[in-house]
């Protein structure tokens, strides 16, 4: 899929490579979108990937002295979901991150990547647009700051130049008088692209009069848009039922939806009104936290990010040498597979066929493995990420030669039919039990949102999870 894979050890090195390769190179962090685009042949002419995941301190969420929140380019969606700062001072962003994909995807996918992919249905763009975010772009020639509202030029198009990378996402933290909410309408409750999404933020005075309002809409125009007519109308108003109704109607003025396989334009337009009203009603009722759990299930383990290569005494890996990795506590040195996904590397080069390929696009979870402690979809991970990493596959799930307690529960409850999806369910479940030894039904459901079974109807699988959770 690529000819060269650079795992850089300094930011300067990444920028120099971008300057040299330009249109032929792409920055890799989570790679969850890019891998699929390369597999499908959507991205043409890309010869080199520049992996920045080993650079230190780019995965931080910080609050500066002026009250601004900063996200580094390696901050993942699950980091935002779990961050007390984001939950307390940027709740709509935490809610949007929770809606992205499944836990295995959120452990890899970055907020920066979601912004750069630039789909009008990408969840995190909408709240960041409402939060008045600014992105900082850097190259060998210097850096510049661009308001997120000016970052997009069309569907999947941005002002990012071929030699630039996004180095920072910044926005003002919400103040105590400000309340906000993100709502996503999709065809399923997980692993689904938005039909419509909305982020609403209102600043209320002591009389509950709106001092200012910000409303952003996703999946209803070529880019994420602000509902300026509704924002202007709400300013100075008290949030009565009639005001909420009119705000929903005015929000429709900003929407220019299309017909597609997920919904006709008329439905989308009507749902803009309804979802905007729902968000405003929840804010009025003090229920803006919505469905975001108090303790979200992450499947992230104890070390979700790889150690910098500099700690191993090694410089950049160009992807044309060997991959040295530890799989199931056994060290491997493998001279092949650098141009593959981790899934195919494990099956074809490491000789471990237990990890299955069900969809090769991050939908089914059959390929779930642990990479540096976190559950990931191995079909969406470049194989060179295994270099100096710790990997656990289904073959390594047994504890001291005895089946894992979830494996034993699957046998006891007859939770296997064709068995093709079983390795993925077991890996997700084992990480759940590590993170939450006695999960409830809702937590079990959260853990397997990224795993599909086409045989059992899930009842036996859920019974096995519940049995294991009681042991």
Give, region by region, the residue ranges found by the protein language model:
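Ferredoxin-type iron-sulfur electron-transfer modules in oxidoreductases and energy-metabolism complexes
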Residues: 94, 245, 337-353, 380-471
């Amino acid at each position: 899929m690529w000819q060269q894979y650079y795992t850089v050890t300094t930011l300067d090195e990444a920028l120099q490579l971008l300057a040299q390769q330009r249109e032929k190179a792409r920055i890799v962090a989570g790679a969850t979108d890019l891998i699929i685009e390369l597999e499908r042949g959507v991205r043409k002419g890309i010869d080199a990937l520049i992996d920045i995941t080993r650079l230190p301190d780019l995965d931080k969420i910080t609050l500066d002295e002026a009250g601004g929140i900063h996200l580094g380019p390696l901050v993942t969606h699950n980091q935002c979901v779990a961050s007390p700062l984001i939950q307390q001072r940027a709740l709509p962003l935490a809610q949007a991150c929770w809606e992205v994909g499944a836990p295995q995807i959120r452990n890899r996918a970055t907020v920066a990547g979601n912004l750069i992919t630039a789909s009008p249905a990408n969840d995190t763009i909408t709240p960041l647009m409402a939060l008045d975010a600014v992105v900082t772009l850097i190259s060998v020639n210097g850096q510049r700051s661009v308001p997120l509202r000016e970052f997009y030029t069309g569907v999947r198009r941005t002002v990012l130049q071929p030699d630039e990378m996004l180095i920072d996402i910044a926005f003002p933290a919400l103040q105590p008088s400000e309340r906000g909410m993100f709502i996503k309408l999709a065809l399923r409750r997980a692993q689904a692209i938005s039909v419509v999404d909305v982020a609403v933020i209102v600043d209320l005075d002591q009389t509950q009069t709106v001092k200012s309002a910000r409303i952003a809409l996703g999946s209803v125009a070529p880019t994420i848009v602000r509902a300026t007519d509704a924002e202007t109308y709400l300013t100075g108003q008290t949030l009565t039922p009639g005001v909420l109704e009119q705000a929903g109607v005015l929000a429709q003025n900003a929407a220019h939806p299309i017909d597609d396989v997920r919904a006709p334009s008329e439905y989308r337009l009507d749902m803009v009104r309804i979802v905007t009203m729902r968000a405003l009603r929840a804010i009025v009722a003090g229920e803006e936290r919505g469905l975001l759990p108090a303790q979200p299930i992450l499947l992230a383990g104890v070390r979700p990010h790889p150690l910098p290569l500099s700690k191993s005494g090694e410089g950049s890996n160009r992807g044309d040498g060997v991959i040295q990795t530890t799989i199931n506590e056994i060290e491997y040195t493998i001279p092949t597979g650098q141009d593959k996904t981790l899934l195919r590397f494990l099956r074809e080069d490491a000789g471990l066929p237990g990890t299955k390929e069900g969809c090769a696009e991050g939908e089914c979870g059959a390929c779930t493995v642990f990479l540096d402690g976190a559950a990931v979809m191995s079909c969406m991970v470049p194989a060179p990420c295994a270099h100096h990493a710790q990997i656990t596959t289904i073959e390594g799930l047994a504890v001291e030669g005895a089946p894992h307690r979830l494996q034993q529960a699957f046998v006891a409850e007859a939770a296997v039919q064709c068995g093709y999806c079983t390795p993925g369910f077991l890996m997700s479940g084992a990480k759940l039990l590590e993170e939450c030894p006695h999960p409830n039904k809702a937590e079990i459901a959260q853990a397997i949102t990224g795993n599909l079974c086409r045989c059992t109807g899930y009842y036996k699988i859920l019974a096995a999870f519940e049995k294991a959770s009681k042991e």
